[in-house]
């Protein structure tokens, strides 16, 4: 049930992400664009105001206490090193897949509109702490990107990488 509700939420977010990425590609007119995938921990996206929590509970058909329990479960002791960035994509690959879809669709759209521009998205997977994390996330990012490119009949090129931000990753 939770997976389906996440999928529905991501379907709603996809066009907004795609429009944002399209705007970046257009603003940079063919210059390199690095898109850093979702980095903040999930608790930064949940309501804190009682009225907003009540609205969310009503929309989800849950009690305020159930929503508060979910919110509390997302709180982290050390959010700077916790469940965010690459680790978030490991737990919820559908988020990174949605972002990949949005990036690639936006790039294909801008490339069609401006064939003289060099559109080559650079996708950054953030906060990698171990090569296994990067390999795991990169695999489904590449699969998603390649499927979108094939479906569109495009020859779009792209890169997937990371920035070493955590000492143990070096």
Residue ranges and their predicted role:
Residues 1-170:
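Conserved alpha/beta-domain cores
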